[in-house]
C-alpha cells in the first residue's frame, strides 16, 4: 500500500513537472511586413526547437501562422488559440493595458526591430502634413487604430497641440499596403499620401515625384521600435524552460539577421512568396535607420500618448512594466 501510494505521488509529480516545463506545440503568430525577420530565421533554422532540446525539451513542435492585423491576433492570444504573437507597439500597449492585473495578463517578450515608417505623397502642394487639405486622403492600414494612424495623430498633436491630435483622422482611409501603393502610384484617385510599411514605402519612392513628408523617427524623437513580440504570463509561467529557450532563440536569430542580411532576406522572400529581387529586399532591411534589436526603444512614447487620448486608462510608469523581466537589463525606453 505504501509503495502504491508513493508510486502515485511520483506519477503526479512527474505530470506536474511536465505540464509546467514543456509544451508539445508552440503556436507563434506574426503579421505581414519585413518587421519579423527573427521569426523567419527561427522557423527556417528551427532555432527554438534547437534551444529547447539543449535544455532537455525534446520534440517541441512549432506551428507558425500569419494574421492580417493586431485585433484578430490579440483575440487569438487571449482565447488561447496562439501562444506568442508579434506586431506593432500599439498592439502590445493596448493588450497590456486591457489585461493588466488579470489572469490573462500580457507583456512583451522583446523588441524585434527599430525601423522608420514613411508618410509618402505624390501631391505637389503637400510639403508637410500641415499642407493636407480636406480633399486629400491618406491611406493607412486601419484608421485610428493602426501604428500609422496613431503616428499621424501624434504628429498632429505635436504640430497643432494635444487637443487637435485627431485633426487628420477624417482624411485617413483604411487600405492594405499593397493596395495603397497601387493607388498612390496610379496618379489618379483620392489617395494622395500613404503611411505604409517596408518594402512598400521604398517602392513608392522609386516613382518620380513621390517623396517623404514625415519620418516616424521625427515624431518619436529618435529611433523607435517598429515590431515587438508578446505573450501571456500564463504561457510564460506554465513553460519556464521553454520560455528560456525562446529568449535564447531570439538572441541567436537577431545575431543572424545582423550578420547575414541576405540570408534573412531570402527567408522572408520565400515565406511571403515575394517577387522582389533578393538585392532589393536586402537593401531595405539594411537601411541606414534600420536596426534589428531586442531592445525596446521609445515604446513609452506610444503608451503615454495613448493614455493621454484615452485609448488606454493609464500609462505604465516604465517600459519595464510592459515587458517580462528577461529583457529588463537592456537599455530600453
Describe the predicted segments one by one.
Residues 17-23:
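Sec/Tat signal peptide C-region and signal peptidase I cleavage site
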Residues 10-11, 21:
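Cleavable N-terminal signal peptides
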Residues 161, 167-169, 178-270:
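Pocket-lining segment of extracytoplasmic ligand-binding domains
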Residues 306-333:
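Conserved C-terminal helix/tail region of periplasmic/extracytoplasmic solute-binding proteins
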Residues 37, 113-119, 210-211, 225-229, ...:
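Small-molecule pocket liners
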Residues 1-9:
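Bacterial N-terminal signal peptides that target proteins for export
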Residues 236-313:
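Secondary-structure end/capping motifs
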Residues 25-165, 170-174, 188, 192-198, ...:
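Short, glycine-/small- and polar/acidic-enriched structural segments
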Amino acid at each position: 500500500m505504501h509503495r502504491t501510494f508513493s508510486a502515485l505521488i511520483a506519477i503526479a509529480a512527474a505530470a506536474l513537472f511536465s505540464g509546467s516545463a514543456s509544451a508539445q506545440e508552440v503556436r507563434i503568430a506574426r503579421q505581414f511586413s519585413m518587421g519579423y525577420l527573427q521569426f523567419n530565421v527561427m522557423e527556417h533554422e528551427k532555432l527554438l526547437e534547437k534551444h529547447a532540446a539543449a535544455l532537455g525539451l525534446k520534440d517541441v513542435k512549432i506551428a507558425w501562422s500569419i494574421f492580417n492585423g493586431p485585433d484578430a491576433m490579440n483575440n487569438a492570444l487571449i482565447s488561447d488559440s496562439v501562444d506568442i504573437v508579434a506586431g506593432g507597439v500599439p498592439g502590445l500597449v493596448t493588450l497590456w493595458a486591457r489585461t493588466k492585473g488579470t489572469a490573462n495578463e500580457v507583456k512583451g517578450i522583446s523588441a524585434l526591430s527599430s525601423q522608420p515608417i514613411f508618410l509618402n505623397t505624390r501631391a505637389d502642394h503637400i510639403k508637410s502634413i500641415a499642407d493636407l487639405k480636406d480633399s486629400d486622403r491618406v491611406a493607412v492600414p486601419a484608421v485610428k487604430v493602426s501604428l500609422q494612424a496613431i503616428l499621424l495623430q501624434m504628429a498632429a498633436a505635436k504640430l497643432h497641440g494635444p487637443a487637435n491630435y485627431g485633426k487628420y483622422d477624417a482624411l485617413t482611409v483604411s487600405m492594405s499596403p499593397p493596395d495603397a501603393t497601387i493607388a498612390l502610384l496610379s496618379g489618379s484617385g483620392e489617395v494622395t499620401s500613404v503611411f505604409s510599411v517596408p518594402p512598400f514605402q521604398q517602392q513608392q519612392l522609386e516613382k518620380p515625384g513621390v517623396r517623404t513628408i514625415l519620418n516616424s523617427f521625427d515624431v518619436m524623437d529618435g529611433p523607435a521600435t517598429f515590431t515587438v513580440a508578446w505573450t501571456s504570463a500564463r504561457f510564460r509561467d506554465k513553460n519556464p524552460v521553454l520560455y528560456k529557450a525562446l529568449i535564447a532563440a531570439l538572441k541567436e536569430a537577431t545575431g543572424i539577421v545582423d550578420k547575414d542580411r541576405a540570408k534573412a532576406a531570402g527567408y522572408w522572400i520565400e515565406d511571403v512568396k515575394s517577387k522582389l529581387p533578393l538585392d532589393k529586399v536586402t537593401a531595405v532591411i539594411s537601411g541606414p535607420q534600420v536596426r534589428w534589436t531586442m531592445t525596446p526603444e521609445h515604446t513609452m512614447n506610444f503608451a503615454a500618448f495613448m493614455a493621454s487620448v484615452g485609448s488606454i486608462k493609464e500609462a505604465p510608469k516604465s517600459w519595464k512594466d510592459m515587458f517580462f523581466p528577461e529583457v529588463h537589463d537592456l537599455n530600453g525606453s
